[in-house]
Amino acid sequence: MALPIIVKWGGQEYSVTTLSEDDTVLDLKQFLKTLTGVLPERQKLLGLKVKGKPAENDVKLGALKLKPNTKIMMMGTREESLEDVLGPPPDNDDVVNDFDIEDEVVEVENREENLLKISRRVKEYKVEILNPPREGKKLLVLDVDYTLFDHRSCAETGVELMRPYLHEFLTSAYEDYDIVIWSATNMKWIEAKMKELGVSTNANYKITFMLDSAAMITVHTPRRGLIDVKPLGVIWGKFSEFYSKKNTIMFDDIGRNFLMNPQNGLKIRPFMKAHLNRDKDKELLKLTQYLKEIAKLDDFLDLNHKYWERYLSKKQGQ
């Protein structure tokens, strides 16, 4: 019986339709080699487990109880020259085509149709609380791709693509902020990424909850047409006793994602080409200090996060 599987690797999805339940995990890896060029011994397939343990190569696919078109994430690097591995990743339209949001804010932020969409998300979107909100803490909302790790470069493990100082950053932030992850992908991939990076299991901090693309809304802008955004109003509507405009900050490498809440957004520099930039990227180290400084404030509304480095430099010079 044919068992169609979808494998995600290097920012692309590959459809596997020629294997059956009698084929083995090694057969799957051999087939993926023809699609991706990654040798079987270099492949790590996330989510293929038997009795809670990673499936060995000789395990038959039928024993994994996979549903048709199950999506699997693959980690692994091609056997190619280091120069090729370090080459530029595919163009990311979200980064290249991002635009300055300031001109569009007035027309979008308070439009009734957009506020109604947020109200629907507040009512209908189900949030799985991983750790209860803490009284008196501020809120830090974090994007994933290009913010916390480089999701386009190739590597054997997610840790190789992790942004430098990630765990130190989250540990420090957790002292003053509840931490929420919000990615424009689906929850399965978010959970897999957080597990691979060691975020969801770290003992030094806790994630309050995670949001996926289903919590986003589509808005119409005069110049850019329809775009998807991350409205913080969804969080504020669901957790109004804890979070508001006054105590929330959101990091994202794509400025338009906080088009509905520009006052609360900080556009972080994207972390790309991890192999080249791992030793040079200090963004999270500096932002750790910024979060610590503004945590002293009762109200974030007087801040302009666009100039966060200037603010930090001024405070540290006092």
UniProtKB/Swiss-Prot annotation:
Residues 3-81 form the Ubiquitin-like domain. Interacts (via ubiquitin-like domain) with PSMD2/RPN1 (via C-terminus) which is a 19S regulatory particle subunit of the 26S proteasome. Pfam families: NIF (PF03031), ubiquitin (PF00240). It catalyses: O-phospho-L-seryl-[protein] + H2O = L-seryl-[protein] + phosphate; O-phospho-L-threonyl-[protein] + H2O = L-threonyl-[protein] + phosphate. This is Ubiquitin-like domain-containing CTD phosphatase 1. SMART domains: CPDc (SM00577), UBQ (SM00213). The modification N6-acetyllysine is found at K117. GO terms for molecular function: metal ion binding; proteasome regulatory particle binding; protein serine/threonine phosphatase activity. Its EC number is 3.1.3.16. It is found in: Nucleus. Broadly expressed, with highest levels in placenta, lung, testis and ovary. Up-regulated in tumor tissues. Its cofactor is Mg(2+). The modification N-acetylalanine is found at A2. It comes from Homo sapiens. Residues 133-294 form the FCP1 homology domain. Changing K44A: Aberrant diffuse pan-cellular localization and loss of binding to PSMD2. GO terms for biological process: negative regulation of ATP-dependent activity; regulation of proteasome assembly. Dephosphorylates 26S nuclear proteasomes, thereby decreasing their proteolytic activity. Recruited to the 19S regulatory particle of the 26S proteasome through its interaction with 19S component PSMD2/RPN1. Once recruited, dephosphorylates 19S component PSMC2/RPT1 which impairs PSMC2 ATPase activity and disrupts 26S proteasome assembly. Has also been reported to stimulate the proteolytic activity of the 26S proteasome. Gene3D superfamilies: HAD superfamily/HAD-like, Phosphatidylinositol 3-kinase Catalytic Subunit, Chain A, domain 1. One of its GO terms (cellular component) is nucleolus. It comes from the Eukaryota. Changing L46A: No effect on proteasome binding or nuclear localization. Mg(2+) binds at D143, D145, D253.
